[in-house]
A protein has these predicted regions:
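Flexible, solvent-exposed loop/hinge segments and secondary-structure transition points
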Residues: 2-201
Length: 201
């Protein structure tokens, strides 16, 4: 009985020590991880927006886009890029939930009129050498200059205007659909996104 009590005490001390170490590590790494995410967002914004002279992550509008499974609001942040204080472009993230291997997160940059300036794939788990080719410049470049009215927002295999990837139609189809839905949301809420007062991001 004495050995069991001693063993329980030792295990308790080890568990408490491990918990303390984990909380210290989390505390030390929280800020660097947040800063890394911010830098990733800024890099994507620079890639998809036209030349700007403001900090788009400090000129944002957040709108509720729906509800999650628990009934909580889902919001989308719109980053506004300006040149000489005039709106030059808007960027926002979209999620393609129907990628071959899960979610594909995309940053979309558009003109104030709703034409795509560029897209950047932020995260994906698509098959290397197949679906992963959605990150290649030739694939992303075909979105530039396209709007809802002047493009058929389907891959060519489905009769649309976007090239798919040989052997991997699901990933490109998911990206095209997500970008189209993002453009539709922007069109529905354009005035609110463009004219809302600036808020700190």
């Amino acid at each position: 009985m004495k050995d069991i009590s001693r063993l329980a005490l030792v295990l308790t001390v080890i568990a408490a020590g491990a918990g303390l170490i984990l909380s210290l590590v989390e505390g030390v790494t929280r800020e660097p991880i947040a800063e890394q995410r911010r830098l990733q967002t800024l890099k994507a914004l620079q890639a998809v927006l036209p030349p700007i002279d403001n900090a788009p992550d400090a000129d944002t509008v957040s709108l509720v886009t729906g509800k999650d499974k628990k009934g909580r609001d889902i919001s989308r942040t719109f980053y506004r890029g300006r040149q000489a204080n005039d709106l030059a472009g808007v960027a926002f993230k979209v999620i393609a939930p129907d990628g071959y291997s899960g979610n594909i997160e995309i940053m979309v940059g558009i003109t104030p009129e709703g034409t795509v300036n560029g897209i950047e794939i932020l995260t994906h788990a698509e098959t290397p050498g197949l679906g992963s080719k959605i990150v290649e410049p030739w694939f992303k470049e075909q979105f530039r200059g396209k709007g809802l009215e002047d493009a058929d927002w389907r891959v060519k295999k489905d009769g649309g205007g976007f090239d798919q990837i040989t052997g991997a139609t699901i990933s490109p189809r998911a990206v095209v659909t997500a970008v189209r839905k993002g453009l539709e949301f922007f069109r529905e809420h354009r005035q609110q996104i463009i004219e809302a007062g600036r808020s700190e991001g």
